[in-house]
Amino acid sequence: MQPENLFGPITQIGYLTDDIETTAAFWTQTSGIGPWTRMSGVSMATTMDGEPSTINIDVAITYKDDIQIELINPLCDSPSPYLANKRAGLWGLHHMQFTTKDINASMELAKSAGLELACTIKQGGGVYTYLRGHGVWFEMIQASEELEMFFGMIKSACDDWDGKELIRDIAL
């Protein structure tokens, strides 16, 4: 009997890096994916382990088929889901993201599965939560029309990519 899939399909795989340009080029050379949409200096108000925090990151996003690949470069030492990895120099796989229509119901399922809420972020019309898992973070994102349009724009750029302009910078 196959185990139950509590959260639906994985919608994103997140990686930490200290060099988005080099990491994006590597992914493109080895996987043929691109272009990358980069947002620099993104500041987010968060709650990490019950305490308010502000984190600053550079982030770049692309798609491989229907899976979003996210590169995150943490720019600060504020409490965040990224801090321990950054301090230890642990770059690479960081989290799996699941998109949900009901984040509260998904959070209850996560807790019943033994995952622990660590961080909540409200940014760009969305609510994101990070949960501690066994060696990898689980991220839940509340689906919204605004986010679907934004991610749809990035996916369309990937579907139509001609191999030029590896990184496209946008402001949030």
Where are these regions (language model features)?
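Short acidic/glycine-enriched loop/turn segments that link adjacent beta-strands
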Residues: 123-127
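Glyoxalase I/VOC metalloenzyme domain signal
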Residues: 1-11, 15-37, 51-58, 63-116, ...
